[in-house]
Swiss-Prot record:
It comes from Lotus japonicus. The gene is PCS1. Requires cadmium for activity. Also activated in vitro by Zn(2+), Cu(2+), Fe(2+) or Fe(3+) ions, but not by Co(2+) or Ni(2+) ions. The keyword Zinc applies. Belongs to the phytochelatin synthase family. The keyword Iron applies. This is Glutathione gamma-glutamylcysteinyltransferase 1. GO terms for biological process: cellular detoxification of cadmium ion; detoxification of copper ion; phytochelatin biosynthetic process. Its EC number is 2.3.2.15. One of its GO terms (molecular function) is glutathione gamma-glutamylcysteinyltransferase activity. Residues 1-221 form the Peptidase C83 domain. Keywords: Acyltransferase, Cadmium, Copper, Iron, Metal-binding, Transferase, Zinc.
Amino acid sequence: MAMAGLYRRLLPSPPAVDFASSQGKQLFLEAVQNGTMESFYRLVSYFQTQSEPAFCGLASLSMVLNALAIDPGRKWKGPWRWFDESMLDCCEPLDKIKARGISFGKLVCLAHCAGAKVEAFHASHSSIDHFRKYVMKCSTSDDCHVISSYHREALKQTGTGHFSPIGGYHAGKDMALILDVARFKYPPHWIPLTHLWEGMNYVDESTGKTRGFMLISRPHREPGMLYTLSCKHESWNSIAKFLIDDIPFLLTSEDVKDICKVLSVIVTSLPSNFEEFIKWVAEIRRGEDGSPSLSVEEKARLSVKEEILKQVQRTGLFKHVASFLSHSCSGHTPTSGDRDTFPVIAASVCCQGAEILGGKISSSAEYCCRETCMKCWKAEDDKPIRMVCGTVVNGNTEQGVDVLIPSSCGKLSCTCSSTTKSIRKHPASTDVLTVLLLSLPTSTWAGIADEKLLSEIHDLVSIENLPALLQEEVLHLRRQLHILKRCQEGKVDEDLGVPLS
């Protein structure tokens, strides 16, 4: 019985020149001599094949992020933190990308959320000279890379829209080296820049916008260490809208006279599942037999997370939030049920950890955490370390998962009573809500009529008043929120040049 299938495609030449051909090798040698292949070496070290037919954008981005040595802040498999297509799910659910690919603007969104510095241009708002300038810039350096979004038809290739990184440039021939991530289809190849530019001028039917190119480089600061925004839950659209649009309106329409009233207006209106939108990032690894031990790197990361948690709990805003949320003060809580209790959090994180360590693009609902236990021990520097150890079951398989928990010890006195309450040791709703409020745009509070209260609010949320680590966390979340709101409005493909501050 016959079986249908394809084994690669013949590269149309011209216009392309196969990188491995004698002519392709000669172009490479000449470009190396002219200094326009500097980006090639790091990129080719992390060259990968897209794992799904529609994952060209994700493969291109993960390849570039790894080439730039940007730390994803979470593990891929085993002990390794590494960008993989399955981890790029901040701006669009993976199942949707798998079904229909990703737009240029949403790939830009993903690059921002992954912690990269991004400059992006639609072809309709650029020029071939502008494009050539940036290709030359990145080809003579190894600290920035270009990803091109183009239509294959302009290159006389089969297929439609495609993403791939540019691995170098030959100035004399005006040709770019395409490191095609669809390696099952076409090999790396040189292509005249004019043809590539033509391909970028095709309109993407899903957005009505032309394709384009983006420059990706390392940021001056690393992405969020402890907190991040997530669009995995289907409610993220409504939550982003609430945070950016509804809160300013509520503060304008309500007669707020003090901080407690401001918090009341916000907390009582919060969507019930807002905690699905902002998460604290747990460090996971495969379960170990015997006495647990931490690498120097794991200790350093845990120490930074704990310092950020302490800095959150030292802010004036945290004290107001904790006081408001305490039962004797308000009776309001932004969580529902027992989802904020430590056993529930531990079981949930273990299931997510097993999913990530298994490298599967699926739902952690398929995993069941059979048991968890807490291990506490002292490191060599006599510092206490807490780890949740869980056994997760998926079908007939079991996976041991260890979760490092950042902790912060302290006491908090409630301003409405004489009682003193212990602060929970793991990141909890009070911390998360505080960070979320700090991350709102500065314009959020502009509608407060009481000038004295407005001044007090500004002092509490001012980025300048925060310590350095927390300042970086808050700025990262502000960028994420701004980008996700643009995604929610469908504007991410329209205003690529809008600042993200």
